Amino acid sequence: IGDWLRAQGVSSAIVLSSIWCRCQRTAEELKYGPVQIEPALASFFDEPLKAKKLNQQLQQRIANALPNKKNQALILVTHHVNIREFVGKDIGSGDMILAQVNAKGQMISFRHYPSP
């Protein structure tokens, strides 16, 4: 996935990951540098009542990152339940979402990319 992202022009990125080890491994394998663990990206599959709260925390984290990211991509590695809560769509394992967000970190529009 990291090679594919580079081929698309993503040369520099801030990478945030769920604490879950499979997400961390994926994030590290992108090879964009240190991975930051973000609690708002943790799966709530077994605790669906946490969905709204974690999504709000994620939006705040994105909003906080926007002013400082400069020309870097902001890559989030997380779980299908989190993605569904954020964009309202189920996607497959390894698929990617390119999301346009507003200054509050709220999704405006998105494009779905199947796993390369």
Regions found by a protein language model. Give the residues of each.
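Active-site-proximal alpha-helix that buttresses catalytic centers in soluble enzyme cores
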Residues: 1-39, 44-48, 53, 89-102, ...
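Glycine-rich phosphate-binding loop signature in dinucleotide/nucleotide-binding domains
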Residues: 8-10, 65-72
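Beta-strand elements within well-structured catalytic alpha/beta cores of enzymes
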Residues: 16-17, 72-78, 82, 99
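Short amphipathic alpha-helix initiation/capping segments at coil-to-helix junctions
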Residues: 51-55, 76-79
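A short, acidic, amphipathic alpha-helical segment used as a generic capping/interface helix at domain edges
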Residues: 57-67
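Flexible, glycine-rich active-site loops centered on histidine and acidic residues
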Residues: 85
